[in-house]
Amino acid sequence: GATDSRYILAAEITKKLSQNEEQEVLKLADDFEKARNEEFENLHLSAKEARLRDKTLHPERYPSIATEQKGWFMYEINPLNMIKNTDTIEFVSPDVCGIKCLPSSFQIIDAENGTLRTWVCDSHKSYIYTPQNLQEGTLIRIEDPDYISGKIRDTGR
């Protein structure tokens, strides 16, 4: 469809995780890290050296894990468009209007293993972790990098 909005709808918060559910996600992350370290320790010396070189050349292949952040809340999200961990995101709902959240104030967590993702998009099961206390159904938007004021873009949909 045509749009002249400066924003892209990026995701919807579908569920606020309970403290127990948050702890399960953090345990999943911890278990993943332990398994990754154990696998590394069981490698042959030359394989360890190769892994360390690869980690230096391609750090994105070895994501950090989520760790507890005091005072933060974890939410299951339904991603609709790409969100990057370098984006400034905004939360919008009936009780909040455009709360900006800088990249340092949120994390994207992979729901399968508890690692921190650098990006997420449609069909990636994931969580947003942030100090913002939000309600279910809150929308997450990002600024459209292709936005031009006064120009309506037709995507052909």
Tell where the protein language model's regions lie, with residue ranges.
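Surface-exposed amphipathic alpha-helical tracts and adjacent flexible/coil segments at the periphery
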Residues: 1-157
